[in-house]
């Protein structure tokens, strides 16, 4: 997960265009929901009737023949009965939203003894008791690692400095992976290491890249080191490189260049994680292309952080909410037409995942219901990007992916 602007690919899902006037990030809201209303949320259409929630099939049963069905959670949600019930009924896999990241596990001061495993251990125990798998997220990324990882004699002894940082990295990964050995079946070893820019392969603003670049070192070396340390600590765990915007050709090219380099060096990498934080205009063809590219390298595909933002407006709105025209906050009851558009996109994406079921072994959403989503805090307006609504009830998007006969109404 990153603090970044949402991606807005170039092409639209044709079905979604039925209910949305303009696709692509340039022009504001949908035809049925104009935003020239003084900044107030557009009037919601009455939602059309959905099937009885009690009749909802379990997601893990609907897709068990294709791939694991997962979701990212905070351990505190396990104490909320409605959340725990959703998890145990619908999911076969759990991901820690933050509890397995370095900023949670690693001590903030190197003089402190021990790691903070408690929250992650709680999640693992819950998963084990309910027969669920656990994906580990993440051993390393550019955000959140305590500063002491990178302290040392950069100027006076650059080679010694790089070796010191390397040892800290290897020790940390070894300790964490060993702690969760036999409980975590797959790890996002490195997260968001590819550059967004054309002509630059690696994310060079990462403190890890910068540390390994000191004194003319190979800034990208930390990626190989991380994978080798993880494999040594748990030979049975699947090891992934996890990235956002893999559906965008330029970003995907950078990621694949990294993957190809790792493969050429014999680095133990098992698959690619596709975050897929997308919007209503995502190109399913582009998503399919991303999955195909991984298949061509004989690697596994995991969809790791899926959500679909209901706001289709300039990407600057996601960051600063200051570049008009921006869609006003829908609140917790988005227009039915927007939810229908979202349902069409979810159905199209899950059809793509099924088409690639030979390589897609896991599909996880980043959250389980709309009352708990990073997009609301990140964008500063209420988002509803998941399969269950703010009351934990199945949305049109849910019914769209579990029932091919469910008619998605594009008008009310």
What are these regions (language model features)?
Residues 66-70, 93-95, 133-135, 184-188, ...:
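Structural preference for beta-strand elements that scaffold enzyme active sites
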Residues 56, 91, 120-127, 169-177, ...:
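Generic structural signal for well-ordered alpha-helices
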Residues 3, 13, 17-55:
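Bacterial Sec-dependent N-terminal signal peptides
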Residues 42-93, 97:
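Boundary/entry segment of secreted carbohydrate-active catalytic domains
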Residues 59-66, 74-84, 204-325:
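Noncatalytic carbohydrate-binding groove/subsite architecture in carbohydrate-active enzymes
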Residues 76-83, 101-106, 373-374:
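Short, solvent-exposed loop/turn elements at domain surfaces
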Residues 106, 179, 188, 192-216, ...:
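Aromatic-rich peripheral "rim/lid" segments of glycoside hydrolase catalytic domains that contact
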Residues 89-110, 118-246, 310-314:
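Substrate-binding cleft and catalytic face of glycoside hydrolase catalytic domains
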